[in-house]
């Protein structure tokens, strides 16, 4: 199983800045554009009554004021990425993806 910190660095490379946040508390003041991600599931595959494969599922959200953000395109090309939805909140565009890592 790959580490979350490895995933974090890959997301930093996609974004091009360090504004990548893992489960940020509400008290943090984020800078944009940003990527926010959180763990959403840990599906297991079993064999002989043991877990033999475990891949963590993450919800990844690209947040940008630009509705045509190139970051969304780069995120969509991430291995295992699946686009979920787009919405606007507080004047910022949010594009959510599911990835397994």
Enumerate the predicted regions with their spans.
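Small/polar-rich, solvent-exposed N-terminal microdomains that initiate assembly or binding
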Residues: 1-42, 50
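Signature of extracytoplasmic/envelope-associated structural regions
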Residues: 20-21, 69, 96
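A generic structural micro-feature
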Residues: 29, 50-55, 89-93
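Oligomerization/assembly interface segments of phage tail-like spikes and tubes
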Residues: 54-65, 93-101
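Short, conserved charged micro-motifs
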Residues: 67-73
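Acidic-leaning, charged glycine-interspersed low-complexity segments
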Residues: 74-101
């Amino acid at each position: 199983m790959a580490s979350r910190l490895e995933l974090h660095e890959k997301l930093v490379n996609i974004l091009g800045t360090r504004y990548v946040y893992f489960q940020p508390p509400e008290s943090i003041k984020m800078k944009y554009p940003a990527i926010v991600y959180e763990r959403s599931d840990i599906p297991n595959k079993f064999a002989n009554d043991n877990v033999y494969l475990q891949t963590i599922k993450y919800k990844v959200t690209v947040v940008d004021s630009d509705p045509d953000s190139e970051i969304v395109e780069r995120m969509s090309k991430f291995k295992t990425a699946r686009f979920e939805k787009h919405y606007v909140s507080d004047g910022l565009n949010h594009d959510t993806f599911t990835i397994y890592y």
